[in-house]
Amino acid sequence: MHKPQSFFHLHLISDATGETLLAAGRAAAAQYKNARAIEHIYPLVRTEKQLEKVFASIDEEPGIVLYTIVDQKLARQVDERCQAMGLPCVSVLEPVLAVFQSYLGTPAGRRVGAQHVLDAEYFRRIDALNFTMEHDDGQLPHNVEEADIVLVGVSRTSKTPTSIYLANRGIKTANVPIVLDAPLPEPLLNAKRPLVVGLIASAERISQVRQNRLLGASHVDFDAYVDRAEIARELAYARQLCNRHNWPVIDVTRRSIEETAAAILALRGKSW
C-alpha cells in the first residue's frame, strides 16, 4: 500500500540566479518519493534588507533552507537565523569550495555568480529576474505592459515559481492573483504587449497545498481557504475571466514547473 504523499517547504536563497540551488535541491528531493517539495526561490539576494524579506517569508512557511551566498556576513546571518528558528540549513557550495581550497592550496575568489559567463544573455536573465521579483503577486500593476508574459490564477497555482523559472530564461514575467469576485487591475486588462496565461489546478490539489501552507499558522478564513467547494467557485470565476478576455488556460495539476513553462513558451511561440 502506498503512503500518502506529504509536503514540505524548500527555501532556496541565492545571490545569483538560483539555478545551482534548484538543481541541487531537486536532486535531493527526488530521493523521497512520498514527500513533495514546495519550492520557494529567492534569487539576487545581496543585501540585509533583501534577506529580511526572505526570512519573513520563511517564517510563514518553515522548512529546509539551502543557500549559495558569497558574502560571508550575509551567509552567517542565514545560518544564525535558521539556527534561531530551529530550521535545517545548508550552504550548498561551501563544502565543495573547502575541498577545492584544500587541494589547490588557495582560497576561492568569492565572486557572485562566478559559474555564469557574463555575456549579454546573462545580463538579460538578471534583468528579467529583477523585473519578475518586482512584479510578483500583483505588485506594480501600472507597468505590467512591460512584461513579456503575465500569469494569472487563484492562490497556490504555482504562479511565482513558474514566473521565476521563465525569468531564468530571460523572459520578463509578472503574475497577478485572481480573487473571487474581485476585478483585475485595469492596466492588465488594457495591456497589449504581454501574453496573458491563466493557471488553474484541481480543487483537491489546491486544497491540499493550502492546508500544508497553513500548518502551524493561524488564518482567520482557514475553513473557506481550504474548502474544496469554495475553491471550485474561485476556479470557476478564474475560468470565466480568462474566457472573457480570450486568455489561454493551463491546468498545472499534474505538471511540473518545467512542463508548465514549456506549455507557456509554446503558446508564446504561437502569439509572437
Swiss-Prot record:
Its EC number is 2.7.11.32, 2.7.4.27. It comes from the Bacteria. InterPro entries: Kinase-pyrophosphorylase, PPDK_reg. Keywords: Kinase, Nucleotide-binding, Serine/threonine-protein kinase, Transferase. Pfam families: Kinase-PPPase (PF03618). One of its GO terms (molecular function) is ATP binding. ADP binds at G153, V154, S155, R156, T157, S158, K159, T160. It catalyses: N(tele)-phospho-L-histidyl/L-threonyl-[pyruvate, phosphate dikinase] + ADP = N(tele)-phospho-L-histidyl/O-phospho-L-threonyl-[pyruvate, phosphate dikinase] + AMP + H(+); N(tele)-phospho-L-histidyl/O-phospho-L-threonyl-[pyruvate, phosphate dikinase] + phosphate + H(+) = N(tele)-phospho-L-histidyl/L-threonyl-[pyruvate, phosphate dikinase] + diphosphate. The keyword Nucleotide-binding applies. NCBIfam families: PRK05339.1. PANTHER family: PYRUVATE, PHOSPHATE DIKINASE REGULATORY PROTEIN 1, CHLOROPLASTIC. Belongs to the pyruvate, phosphate/water dikinase regulatory protein family. PDRP subfamily. Bifunctional serine/threonine kinase and phosphorylase involved in the regulation of the pyruvate, phosphate dikinase (PPDK) by catalyzing its phosphorylation/dephosphorylation. This is Putative pyruvate, phosphate dikinase regulatory protein.
